[in-house]
């Protein structure tokens, strides 16, 4: 049996977004907010999160917009254009949700990592740009810029990892503009490419795990 209670952990539905809390027996102070891709639900991000941070508390969140048999985070117009009012509204609700969930479960947002995939990663990038200071660490898998008009947000002190797929023909070309955008706003961006398409897997987990350990390893070596 895994040390987590599993994907079927209780579904909390009393905050703005439904979510499951998965806390390992040997949980430390690390936590990951998980934002899934389009047309699925919160359980799909748990396996990769377990690979990335086995001792982290996981907050697996479900998007509120229906898409086929699953969910997404905001309305889309085409595969690469999105309803701006929906982005801003859902991002605002998520900012409040993250603060409330962290307070309820004793999580430190300053130490939390927001791990998003595809549509979920795009919600996280919007969250950073529209709510300065809320997100301090973000790992964005297969992300793209979605805001037509980003405010002049100061992201100094925010660490961001962007992982694109070399064979992701639709969304891969949008990764460099996102890197440029977040750098422009002062974020510390690490951009990587994996030899895959839009799907995510072991290579992504390895990169995120290494990225998260980086500053801690440097600090230990310096000490």
What would you call each of these model-derived segments?
Residues 47, 126-130:
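Active-site signature of alpha/beta-hydrolase-fold catalytic machinery across serine-
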Residues 179-183, 188-223:
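C-terminal catalytic histidine-bearing segment of alpha/beta-hydrolase fold enzymes
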Residues 10-107:
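Serine-hydrolase catalytic machinery in alpha/beta-hydrolase-like enzymes
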Residues 47-48, 172-181:
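Short alpha-helix in the alpha/beta-hydrolase fold that links the catalytic acid
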Residues 133-145:
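A conserved short beta-strand
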Residues 115-120, 124:
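Gly/Ala-rich beta-loop-alpha elbow adjacent to hydrolase catalytic centers
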Residues 161-164:
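Short beta-strand/loop motif that positions the catalytic acidic residue
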Residues 166-173, 199:
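Acidic catalytic loop of the alpha/beta-hydrolase fold
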């Amino acid at each position: 049996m895994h040390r987590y209670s599993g994907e079927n952990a209780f579904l909390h539905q009393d905050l703005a977004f439904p979510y499951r809390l998965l806390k390992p027996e040997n949980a430390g102070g690390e936590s990951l907010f998980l934002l899934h891709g389009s047309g699925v639900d919160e359980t799909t991000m748990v396996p990769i999160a377990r690979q990335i941070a086995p001792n982290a508390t996981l907050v697996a969140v479900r998007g509120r917009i229906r898409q086929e048999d699953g969910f997404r985070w905001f309305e889309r117009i085409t595969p690469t254009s999105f309803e701006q009012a929906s982005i801003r509204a859902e991002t605002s609700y998520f900012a409040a949700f993250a603060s409330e969930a962290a307070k309820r479960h004793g999580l430190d947002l300053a130490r939390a990592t927001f791990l998003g995939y595809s549509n979920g990663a795009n919600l996280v990038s919007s969250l950073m740009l529209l709510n300065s200071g809320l997100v301090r660490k973000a790992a964005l898998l297969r992300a793209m810029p979605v805001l037509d008009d980003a405010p002049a947000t100061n992201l100094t002190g925010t660490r961001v990892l962007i992982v694109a797929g070399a064979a992701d023909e639709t969304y891969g070309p949008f990764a460099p503009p996102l890197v440029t955008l977040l750098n422009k706003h002062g974020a510390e961006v690490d951009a990587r490419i994996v030899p895959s398409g839009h799907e995510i897997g072991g290579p992504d987990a390895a990169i995120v795990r290494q990225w998260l350990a980086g500053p801690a390893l440097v600090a230990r070596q310096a000490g």
